[in-house]
Every structure is written in structure tokens, then in C-alpha cells.
Regions:
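Alpha-helical transmembrane bundles and membrane-interface segments of multipass inner-membrane proteins
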Residues: 1-154
Length: 154
């Protein structure tokens, strides 16, 4: 299980960084391209803060929080690997770690996170939200960790 989780972390981070590199090289800032019949959009957005641009006026704090959170996730993962069972929790944490590595790398190297996946919702506030593969991995990983911890307590 541990090897699979390590491969997953590298795969998520690698896929997300490749997507970010493509977007940075081929899109202008705020440029949008419709995909899947207009149900999905590729766009180039620079996020200097945390989720939804929180703390974007404090880039050093954001970098430090991101770096600390990524290290904490890895340490927790090492601790979790030593314990038998809870495969769902381990998988969830691996997804979260892969996304965290990619976004933290962006914050340290670029000073912002490249987001590039959007959905054309009718409500403008929702339509402006832009994600990346790492964000989805963190979200899905958090759900899997909760399920893994819930199942463990039965």
C-alpha cells in the first residue's frame, strides 16, 4: 500500500505541474477555452492566496502555511503507514499530499498557484472559481480520509 501511495503522490503532483506548465506556456492570463461542449473550461488564473484567494495580501504567510501543512501531511502519512489497516485513510492522505506538493511548489517557485479548470455556472460568483488537479485531489482525499476514519471507529 505504501508504494502505491508514493506513486499516487508523485503522479498527482506531476500531472498537476504538467497541466500548470502547459497553461502557463499556452494561455494568456484570464484566457478561457471551452471544452466538453462548453461544460468545462480551461483558463489561466494566478491565485496568490489560499483557497478562494484568502490571505492573498500576505504571500509570505501563505507560503509558510502551505509549506508547514505539506510537511505535516507527510509526517502524518509516515506515522499512518506504520499502522495496519485504514487503506482508505492512507489513500486519502496520499491524494491530499500530491495536491499539496504541487500547490506548495507553485507558491515557492512562482509566488502564486496556477489554477486552470473552471465550470461555466450561470451564477457569476461560482463561474469565476478556478481549480487545478491538486485542488481536486485535496478535496477528494479529505473525503476519503473522513470515510476511512469513520469506518475505523465502527
Amino acid at each position: 500500500m505504501e508504494i502505491a501511495c508514493i506513486i499516487l503522490i508523485i503522479g498527482i503532483a506531476g500531472a498537476d505541474l504538467a497541466g500548470k506548465r502547459y497553461i502557463e506556456g499556452h494561455f494568456q492570463k484570464n484566457q478561457t477555452k471551452d471544452l466538453a461542449g462548453g461544460k468545462l473550461q480551461l483558463r489561466k488564473v494566478h491565485n496568490k492566496g489560499l483557497a478562494f484567494n484568502q490571505l492573498d495580501a500576505k504571500p509570505d504567510l501563505v507560503k509558510n502555511l502551505s509549506f508547514t501543512g505539506t510537511i505535516a501531511a507527510f509526517l502524518y502519512e509516515l506515522w499512518l503507514f506504520r499502522k495496519p489497516g485504514n487503506g482508505m485513510g492512507k489513500l486519502g492522505l496520499a491524494l491530499m499530499s500530491g495536491g499539496a506538493v504541487s500547490n506548495t511548489f507553485d507558491r515557492i517557485k512562482r509566488g502564486y498557484v496556477v489554477d486552470y479548470i473552471g465550470f461555466p455556472f450561470k451564477k457569476e460568483k461560482l463561474a469565476r472559481i478556478t481549480y487545478n488537479i491538486g485542488d481536486f485531489a485535496i478535496f477528494i482525499g479529505a473525503i476519503l480520509m473522513c470515510i476511512g476514519n469513520f469506518d475505523k471507529r465502527k
